[in-house]
Curated annotation (Swiss-Prot):
Name of the protein this chain belongs to: Glutamyl-tRNA(Gln) amidotransferase subunit A
Active site: K76, S151, S175
EC number(s) reported in the record: 6.3.5.7
A GO term, aspect molecular function: ATP binding
NCBIfam families assigned: gatA
Catalytic activity: L-glutamyl-tRNA(Gln) + L-glutamine + ATP + H2O = L-glutaminyl-tRNA(Gln) + L-glutamate + ADP + phosphate + H(+)
One GO BP annotation of this record: translation
Annotated InterPro entries: Amidase, Amidase_CS, Amidase_dom, AS_sf, GatA
Function: Allows the formation of correctly charged Gln-tRNA(Gln) through the transamidation of misacylated Glu-tRNA(Gln) in organisms which lack glutaminyl-tRNA synthetase. The reaction takes place in the presence of glutamine and ATP through an activated gamma-phospho-Glu-tRNA(Gln).
GO cellular component: glutamyl-tRNA(Gln) amidotransferase complex
Residues making up the signal peptide according to the UniProt record: none
Family per similarity comment: Belongs to the amidase family. GatA subfamily.
Keywords for this protein: ATP-binding, Ligase, Nucleotide-binding, Protein biosynthesis
Length: 483
């Protein structure tokens, strides 16, 4: 049951071979046993989860079950969840019980899925290793000396360790795809605007996007069928006809043109990552695809551009956390201004403070034109790079991360090295494109390697087809870490 797909679990539930209460109990038992070691969950609420499972069993018994009814799903602790502690990995929200559900939570509630728990994450989604969480670092289940990636490290760890069959994540610069790669699971960042951001605590609003994390591409499609959809409460939500993202999974890949950016295959990639990625691309050739070289000339600028734009938006978004209406408030202060200063100084961690300072600096008088405006111009050029590349190919591929998971603490004292962990994922967010990572092997110290698959706007069904066809010929996505 631990390795069963979402489709298989849904079929078992529909056929009454197992109840949602039994299924949820099994995953809760496993989560409670493993969480002290991995720290994947911030909150587990057994009573609420089992109550949802009981309600799901009633739905299924009355013939009103849908795909994912009764299936336990782990939710990243960035999504507001009514009646649940919603911390965003921060001391600032360590006492915040959300009074409402985020769009994503509401969509899963509507189909009768079970919320098995809220997963750990980098504070306010700012990090690439899940070491900035107020609740402590998450450990990689393949090697507990290694990071799981971030910021959705808790979700990636929970799925990889089979503490949950699937999870939600968010991706601002790679925060679904990078931890998916480092933990050996599949993760999808949809086209910007496809999944509503309502109730998703904001980091950088023009870059943030929610998405699914699961063992396989097929599971991602089933999750996206629930998560995607127009929401009038989010001004950036796209009004599109609903579609079945699993519809093309079995389509053969004959004639598929795979673009290989020359900027992605450079000496900075670790040899073990390069070998696994090249072997996967070779398998695609056997499946009937052809490869063409393309160029994304502004790729090298994606990290500096991102670290101007994302902190600028964060400095504005995080100004709302002041201790007045909700969240942490400093216990001792002289006056209102002193309360603001002490609350934010004590409530935010060092990485969040660093990005607020950077963002405030680049938006300040005298630097706005030199940094922020120039970064926006380069962002447009990166989108144009992808548009030109997609004239030559259908899908773009490369490594998700330049290395396998690095050791805990290895980069925490060097922010620039940490930021470079997302060198291959950031440009996708700047362009608003969809992209995903799937496991394609193992490298140094038996740590997983991920293949990055980038599609054109709204090409999620095609990307899932491309990933699924590879997974029919491989078993990397079915492998479990040793306990």
């Amino acid at each position: 049951m631990l390795n069963a797909s979402l489709k298989q679990l849904s079929a078992m539930l529909a056929a009454r071979k197992i109840s949602s209460v039994e299924l949820t109990s099994e995953f809760l038992k496993r989560s409670r046993a493993l969480n002290p070691e991995y720290n994947a969950f911030i909150t587990l609420d057994e009573r609420t989860s089992l109550a949802q499972a009981q309600a799901a069993d009633i739905l299924i018994g009355s013939g009103r079950g849908q795909p994912l009814t009764g299936v336990p799903i782990a939710q990243k602790d960035i999504f507001c969840t009514k009646g649940w502690l919603t911390t965003c990995g921060s001391k600032m929200l360590s006492n915040f019980i959300s009074p409402y559900d985020a769009h994503v939570i509401g969509r899963f509630n509507a189909v009768g899925a079970v919320n098995i728990g809220k997963t750990n994450m980098d504070e306010f989604a700012m990090g690439s290793s899940n070491e900035t969480s107020f609740y402590g670092p998450v450990k990689n289940p393949w090697d507990t000396a290694a990071v799981p990636g971030g910021s959705s490290g808790g979700s990636a760890c929970a799925v990889a360790a089979r503490m949950a069959p699937a999870a939600t994540g968010t991706d601002t610069g790679g925060s679904i795809r990078q931890p998916a790669a480092l933990c050996g699971i599949s993760g999808l960042k949809p086209t910007y605007g496809l999944v509503s951001r309502y109730g998703m605590i904001a980091f950088a609003s023009s870059l943030d996007q929610g998405g699914p994390m699961a063992k396989s591409a097929e599971d991602l499609g089933l999750m996206l069928n629930v998560m995607a959809g127009f929401d009038a409460r989010d001004s950036t939500s796209l009004e599109r006809e609903p579609e079945d993202y699993t519809r093309d999974l079995e389509k053969p890949l004959d004639g598929l043109r795979i673009g290989l950016p020359k900027e992605y295959f450079v000496k900075e990639i670790a040899e073990d990552v390069a070998r696994a990625v090249e072997a996967a691309i070779g398998q695609y050739r056997k499946l009937g695809a052809e490869t063409v070289e393309v160029s994304l000339p502004n790729t090298k600028l994606s990290v500096p551009v991102y670290y101007v734009l994302a902190p600028a938006e964060a400095s504005s978004n995080l100004s709302r956390f002041d201790g007045v209406r909700y969240g942490y408030r400093a216990p001792d202060y002289l006056d209102l201004n002193d309360m603001y200063r002490k609350t934010r100084a004590q409530g935010f961690g060092s990485e969040v403070k660093r990005r607020i300072l950077i963002g405030t600096y680049v938006l300040s008088h005298g630097y706005y034109d030199a940094y922020y405006i120039q970064a926006q111009k380069l962002r447009r050029l990166m989108a144009q790079d992808f548009a030109e590349a997609f004239k030559e190919c259908d899908i773009i591929m490369g490594p998700t991360s330049p290395t396998v998971a690095f050791d805990l603490g290895e980069r925490s004292s060097d922010p620039v090295q940490m930021y470079l962990s997302d060198a291959y994922t950031i440009a996708v967010n700047l362009a608003g494109l969809p992209a995903m990572s799937i496991p394609v092997g193992f490298g140094h110290k038996n740590r997983p390697v991920g293949l990055h698959i980038i599609g054109n706007y709204f090409a999620e069904a095609q990307m899932l087809n491309v990933a699924h066809q590879y997974q029919l010929e491989s078993d990397w996505h079915t492998r479990m870490p040793k306990e």
